[in-house]
Amino acid sequence: MQLNDLRSAPGARREKHRPGRGIGSGLGKTGGRGHKGQTSRSGGSIAPGFEGGQQPLHRRLPKFGFVSLKAMDRAEVRTSELNKLEGVVTLQALKDANLVGQHVQRVKVMLSGEVTRAVTLKGIAATKGARAAIEAAGGKFED
């Protein structure tokens, strides 16, 4: 016996449905779509959110909020991520280490995790907790 001789037991696999291939298949003529109507036609599906001509929910509700453009050029860095850097940490150093995107113009350090290295942050803002943690580890800030 070879691998190519192996066959499934009779009745183990169901034959796939082939709609519209005669009455003997059980899905002949209308192919399981029923008679007439939108969903019996080809391309008869309706778009998600369509409510039959009634004003859809997303247009009945009022607009609110906006997208801040400032969020596009600002970023946050965790204190634990500063352990990947050495010496003086600048905005360009963070970009080179892929900790912030290339479009970022301002960075703020947040307290999250431990600081194990003494780093000097140049031109980078920090929260009170992050500032205390960095200075406790022997780091300092320059403006």
UniProtKB/Swiss-Prot annotation:
Which source organism does the UniProt entry give?
Ectopseudomonas mendocina (strain ymp)
What is the purpose of this protein?
A: Binds to the 23S rRNA.
- Domain of life of the source: Bacteria
Gly residues bias (residue ranges): 21-31
Question: SUPFAM superfamilies annotated for this entry?
Answer: Ribosomal proteins L15p and L18e (SSF52080)
Q: Which family does it belong to?
A: Belongs to the universal ribosomal protein uL15 family.
Q: What is this protein called?
A: Large ribosomal subunit protein uL15
Gene Ontology CC entries for this record: cytosolic large ribosomal subunit
Q: Name one GO molecular function term.
A: structural constituent of ribosome
Keywords of this protein's UniProt record, alphabetized? Ribonucleoprotein, Ribosomal protein, RNA-binding, rRNA-binding
Which Pfam families does the record match to this protein? Ribosomal_L27A (PF00828)
Q: Name one GO biological process term.
A: translation
Looking up PROSITE patterns in the UniProt record yields: RIBOSOMAL_L15 (PS00475)
Lineage of producing organism: Bacteria, Pseudomonadati, Pseudomonadota, Gammaproteobacteria, Pseudomonadales
Region (Disordered), start-end ranges: 1-58
Question: Is this entry keyworded Ribosomal protein?
Answer: yes
**Subunit and partners:** Part of the 50S ribosomal subunit.
Q: Which NCBIfam families match?
A: rplO_bact
